[in-house]
Amino acid sequence: GLEFLGSDNKALAFALLTLATGSALLFGYYRYAKTHKNAIYPLSLLSVRTFRVGLNGNLLARLGISSIPLLLPLVLQVSFGYSPSEAGWMIAPMALAAMLTKPLMQKLLQTFGYRNILLANTVLVGVLMMSIALHGPDSPKWLLVLHFFILGGCNSIQFTSMNTITLADLRPYQNTSGNSLMAVNQQLAMGFGIALGSLILRFYQQSDAL
């Protein structure tokens, strides 16, 4: 529904209908889970503070980060003049950094703690995302690759930290439903992030046309 906001009247009507339907289904499940003890996602999960905070943090963080794989290749091609293959290879270091960072997470968390890592890394991710705007067509490729590599590593640190703290305080009988709900939340957040990126892109396209 978010992706169609800002389009013509027919698409806007479809977007509003989709959002209204989704909201109604969510409210319906809330009413169901409130009266049934064997619900797939029991509301008691949300009484665990770390789980609740982790879900909200995951959602907000992925809203911005999930749009990067959509928008960054477009920037590299349209604004910087790279070919599609060049743009794809330029952002490959983000995935490489994410994989290389995973084995270091246990040591980092033991050394600095969840609170310090999440506070510092959240600011760092925001700065790295905003500073992409400082680059231009004349920026050296090695500098762009280094920037994207660091951003990929910081993204990995962010999500790994948030995922582990989300499940940290769940009781054994809550682990299955908690893991499942966290996975659903991640998919929703990524979908919202991509839709939000598309919405912003469409808004600026219309502004340029005007």
What positions do the PLM features span?
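Short, charged N-terminal helix-start/capping segments
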Residues: 3-4, 23-26, 97
